[in-house]
Amino acid sequence: MDKQFSFQGQYDFKTVSTGLYDSWSSASFFKPQKNKVPFTAILPPPNLTGTLHIGHAFEVSITDQIMRFKRLRGYGVNWIPGFDHAGIATQTKYEKLARETNPEYFQAPRKQKVKMIMDWALTQGDTIQSQIKSLGASLNWNQVNFTLSKKASQIVNDSFIQLFEQGFIYQAETLVNWDTKLNTAISNIEVINKPVDQQLYYIAYKLANNPKKRLVVATTRPETIFVDVCLFVHPKDKHYHSFVKQKVVNPLTGALMPVFTDSYVDKKFGTGVLKCTPAHDFNDFALNEKYRLPFVSCIDHNGLLNEHAKQFTGLTVSAARQQVVEFLQTQKLLVKTMPLTSNVGFSERSDTVVEPLLSKQWFVDLPKLKKALAIKKYPELIPKRFNKQVTRWLSQLKPWCISRQLIWGHPIPVWTHKQSGALHVGSTAPTDKQNYTQSTDVLDTWFSSSLWPLICLDWHKNKHFVPTDLLVTGYDILFFWVLRMTFNSYFQTKQLPFKQVLIHGLVRDAQNRKMSKSLNNGINPMDLIRDYGADATRLFLTSNHTPGDDLIFNEQKLKSAANFLNKLWNVTKYVLQLGEQAKTVPSTHLPSTLSERWIWAKLKQLIVQTTKLLDKYQLALANQALVNFIWNDFCNTFIETIKQEDTALLPQLYTTAKTVLSTAVVMLSTVTPFLAERIYQQFHSGSVMQASWPTAKAVKPPKLFADVVEAVSSLRHYKANNQLVANQNLAVVLSGKAAPVVQNYFHFNWVDLRIEVNKTPGFQIKIVDNAANNLAHLEKQRSFYLAEVQRSQAITTNPAFLKKAPPHKVKAELLKLEEYQKKLAEVNHLIAKLTKAE
């Protein structure tokens, strides 16, 4: 019992949380106890590029609630943290800072550059770790990992070497996403598509044997015509049957090009004629592989046109486009131009237009690896609907480019013989290393990240790999991370890396937009913790989403979470004061009151309900049940009845109140650990983290008191929904056989109560005050809500609205309809129940 902490004054989350995290950590509460059934999870490693963002806070809050629940349930929880070196993201972030603070970096040798980035990155890790702790995350900080540590390097090298030796890693020249500013290949996830206003150029390709005839091609990229290899038309497009297998003249080079047919061609786009430029377009590259055509590039890795562009050599892509169009115009080969808005890929890190370019890179042959592994059962995905998406991805796997032209990352363990070109692949250099050149490329960050479970569980030391129990992660990296972890872990261990994957969505702004720098709509979770506290932030984040769905940020709901914690603080103060009052009353053994039996039954129902929900990771529903119990059942009902009970009952009522409160607080500690700890320590020695999850069998609350609760609620609704004269009380008749037993529960300062005992079972209430006027008021309300329900139903069943309106507007209208229907039902209930005897 913590006698030093006082519940005097108003709720102050800063005072509540001060010192608690350090005390938990010092007591080793976050370390797994070896004598318990293990439950292991790994934290998706945040990038060392800055500070914690709202998505991290969302994920950490979800996972920590589950980890705390499992601890209370008796598991030896080991939640393992760590950080991702985040190759391109970290290097570009540091180099941007270095331009202002450390210009010496750009003249430094490679090894020194890596050290400079490492020193900076590790300080970022300290900041992120501090921020995660401020959320109350119960991570095992004695086991922190890093994807660029010596341990990780050994595992990464071993994995690369084994995959290479077994034929799953190879080197090839092929088309990749190329960042011309950073001069490196990048992954699909690092390409951001943005709508761009462009011009669609209609260009004539003359028939070789009849220059008067021509095929017109619509393209946004006339600067790549130099390396066109052929034209395609759709086989069912009758307009072009006579052109098939003929040759046309390249309008910029004069080279002859064949005309082929392929059903890939979109007959409705442009003229229905497609120019094939396999060195600069992924779709064209796929066609090229199908038809085995020659291909060559006219754009170099710096984004400049090369020698194949003739007089346009050395120009940037944008400058070349303009000059090529002018040249075609002079040759009377430009038929027309039309405006077009279409998506263009930009590099997430440099904001440069991404160029599909030919480059010699290293690849993991994922289709071949998948076939060889023959995994029969993948980790269980929650929700199950993501299984379809994963199945589709598995059927469409392509080789994975794993090399990057950066300095920050795991060096590719490959040396090339200077004369023969023979490769040496190993964790150490060849004995005659003077005859070899070491690769200057590094591995894609996702390659080391795909080995994260092995890194976290020290697989290089202990080959007995124990799969983790749960991974909590976002749907946006399900393919890029989760599937690749599954492949790499299974390749090394013949076991899945995790048993279950709980999938969450993104955090979107109040307008349902994805957060981005361009929109400047990002939310800093540290600001939320500063303004509302970690408990309120966690409660909001975990209570307003369902697995797999996005969370729409709503500050009003965050304020509601803070209001609940204030209510919890105040009721704790009241219970503590009740304890002081109870000391002045002689202790006697009296039967439990009706309200006590009711609150015990409600508590048992809550225990059963929340246990089932948290076992299924239905955090939002569990939290809503907890909040509803504490706010309505405990505070608004049970505590209010205490004020009306005989003072002789105070000792037992206090015992019931503190026991129910502290039991509920144990469950609540999973989501609001700071305030829960302070409350728990008022009634118990030790920490709430040493408590056990309560167990119970569900029982039905006493019907008589349940009827009382419903009747009181109806009276309150009636009072709130009717325009009563100032200082006028409700005249209420309480009748029935049980009227004397329950009358205390109706003694409010706004009720004039008259008791009429009769032989009718139970009790009945009847309002006799100004019934006609109040009924008229209720009828008016009913008409209003009925009209709104009908209006909203008309909108939400209108096919045009459902087809054209944005999803968030449809959802908002459906929520409106639900609220109006609820209000209408309440008014109907009052009209039916409160104007006549039950």
Swiss-Prot record:
UniProtKB keywords: Aminoacyl-tRNA synthetase, ATP-binding, Coiled coil, Cytoplasm, Ligase, Nucleotide-binding, Protein biosynthesis
Motif 'HIGH' region boundaries: 46-56
InterPro entries associated with the record: aa-tRNA-synth_I_CS, aa-tRNA-synth_Ia, Anticodon_Ia_Val, M/V/L/I-tRNA-synth_anticd-bd, Rossmann-like_a/b/a_fold, tRNA-bd_arm, tRNAsynth_Ia_anticodon-bd, Val-tRNA_synth_C_sf
One CC-aspect GO term: cytosol
Annotated catalysed reactions: tRNA(Val) + L-valine + ATP = L-valyl-tRNA(Val) + AMP + diphosphate
UniProt enzyme class: ligase
Pfam families assigned to the protein according to its UniProt record, in alphabetical order: Anticodon_1 (PF08264), tRNA-synt_1 (PF00133)
Motif extent ('KMSKS' region): 514-518
Transmembrane segments: none
Any one Gene Ontology BP term: valyl-tRNA aminoacylation
GO terms assigned for molecular function: aminoacyl-tRNA deacylase activity; ATP binding; valine-tRNA ligase activity
Subcellular location: Cytoplasm
Record flagged with keyword Nucleotide-binding: yes
Top-level taxon in the UniProt lineage: Bacteria
Coiled-coil boundaries: 768-838
PANTHER family listed in its UniProt record: VALINE--TRNA LIGASE, CHLOROPLASTIC_MITOCHONDRIAL 2, VALYL-TRNA SYNTHETASES
Family the entry assigns: Belongs to the class-I aminoacyl-tRNA synthetase family. ValS type 1 subfamily.
Quaternary assembly: Monomer.
The protein, known as: Valine--tRNA ligase
